[in-house]
């Protein structure tokens, strides 16, 4: 089914990204919490959405769901320790730099050095985030690594496998940050699928 046309009074040329279900190929807009303008994302066939905050695509040759994914969730709290995260979700402040610093300081995970990037007219940072080699995920709270959350008492974004890895892009939107990421469930994912996911990630325009 084709995506709905924008409302006649809406100046945006694209429809909103569906909150759940299969996504038709096309360009969509996504609201940013605390910012007046949405961003745009272009998605090919075969992707699906979940809860308005994530996009995913399966690898037919891999047993796991969500082989590759894009996350668009707002971040209010970062776990100081991703393994023992219950009671350790800390408010990292509203800036892009604060998020980068909190992720780099997080125990049980590791980050690459952040690289400065420009997305449209906005500046930001990009870095990779992944599980530390010596972490026993079965011993972690809930059997998972909590990366960040929208709330203090529950986890919004977590890793469930040791091979999970993400590339984050955090953009400063005139004092309000936007956080987006592209990831894979483990290293066995088809490289072509990962390249497709990266192209979706790179299509994001603020």
What are these regions (language model features)?
Residues 1-76, 82-83, 152-163, 169-176, ...:
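N-terminal targeting sequences that direct proteins away from the cytosol to non-cytosolic compartments
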Residues 21, 26, 92, 98, ...:
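Generic signature of intrinsically disordered, low-complexity, basic-rich segments
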Residues 63-96, 107-110, 134, 139, ...:
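Post-signal peptide N-terminal regions of Sec-secreted extracellular proteins
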Residues 94, 98, 102, 192, ...:
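Extracytoplasmic/secreted proteins, especially bacterial periplasmic and envelope-associated proteins
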Residues 97-169:
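Signature of long, low-cysteine stretches enriched in small and polar/charged residues
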């Amino acid at each position: 089914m084709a995506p709905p046309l924008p409302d006649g009074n809406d100046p945006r040329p694209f429809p909103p990204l569906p909150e759940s279900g299969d996504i038709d190929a096309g360009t969509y807009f996504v609201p940013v919490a605390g910012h007046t303008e949405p961003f745009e994302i272009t998605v090919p066939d075969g992707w699906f959405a979940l809860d308005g905050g994530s996009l995913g695509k399966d690898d037919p040759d891999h047993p796991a769901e969500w082989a590759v994914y894009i996350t668009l969730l707002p971040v209010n709290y970062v776990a100081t320790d991703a393994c023992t995260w219950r009671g350790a979700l800390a408010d990292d402040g509203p800036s892009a730099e604060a998020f980068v610093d909190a992720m780099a300081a997080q125990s049980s995970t590791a980050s690459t050095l952040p690289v400065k990037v420009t997305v449209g007219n906005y500046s930001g940072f990009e870095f990779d985030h992944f599980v530390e080699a010596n972490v026993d995920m079965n011993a972690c709270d809930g059997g998972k690594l909590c990366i960040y959350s929208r709330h203090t008492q529950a986890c919004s974004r977590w890793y469930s496998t040791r091979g999970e890895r993400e590339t984050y892009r955090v953009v400063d939107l005139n004092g309000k940050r936007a956080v987006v990421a592209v990831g894979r469930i483990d290293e066995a994912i088809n490289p072509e699928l990962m390249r497709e996911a990266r192209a979706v990630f790179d299509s994001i325009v603020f």
